[in-house]
Curated annotation (Swiss-Prot):
Protein species of origin: Saccharomyces cerevisiae (strain ATCC 204508 / S288c)
Keyword Transmembrane: yes
Name the record gives this protein: Non-classical export protein 1
InterPro entries: NCE101
Entry GO CC: cytosol; membrane
Topology of the protein relative to the lipid bilayer: Single-pass membrane protein
């Protein structure tokens, strides 16, 4: 029988925490690298979302 590792915060809270930490770390990475105007993640997502409509 397989024994699962215990949860850090909870069954649903752990994945949400992982997503939040990942998004925050990518935000810090983008700020550190100094990406050119119009090439930030939120701008690219917004552009793709607007093209979809």
């Amino acid at each position: 029988m397989v024994q699962y590792a215990p949860f850090l915060l909870g069954k649903f809270s752990d994945p949400l925490l992982a997503i939040m930490v990942g998004c925050l770390s990518y935000y810090v990475y983008e700020r550190k690298m100094g990406r050119p105007q119009g090439h930030h993640l939120h701008e690219l997502i917004k552009k793709r979302w607007d093209d979809r409509k």
